[in-house]
Amino acid sequence: MSLSDPIADFLTRLRNGQAGMNKVVYVPCSKVVMAVLRILVEEGYIESFTEEVRGDSGIKVLKVFLKYFNSAAAIRKIVRVSRPGKRVYSSADKMPRFYNALGIYIVSTSKGIMLDSHARNAGVGGEILCGVF
């Protein structure tokens, strides 16, 4: 199956998994998705993730362990900002804040994928991939 937007697919799988109160979600493996997952683990939005090989075909998937607080999902809202049809870029000085800095933006910069606050501090702009609250 060919995906035109693997990040949107990944975010949708997370959203649907938490809506269904699942403990684990499987996501197709990619470097960008792994970088976003590392940030989500560091910020406390998900428990952890591991890389697995599924079946005899040798397809790599990421097993994501979702996080809940008192049976409520740790991620209240997760949205895709920059899409293949409409890219959204921002410079470091004009980087927006998600939910008045209560949430985070994940930004793809020339120095790698990082939080919006780290991009502002480093003085680099980039493509705003998604917002998490």
Curated annotation (Swiss-Prot):
Gene3D superfamilies: 3.30.1370.30, 3.30.1490.10. Belongs to the universal ribosomal protein uS8 family. NCBIfam families: PRK00136.1 (NF001109). Part of the 30S ribosomal subunit. Contacts proteins S5 and S12. GO terms for molecular function: rRNA binding; structural constituent of ribosome. Disulfide bonds: none annotated. One of the primary rRNA binding proteins, it binds directly to 16S rRNA central domain where it helps coordinate assembly of the platform of the 30S subunit. One of its GO terms (biological process) is translation. This is Small ribosomal subunit protein uS8. GO terms for cellular component: ribonucleoprotein complex; ribosome.
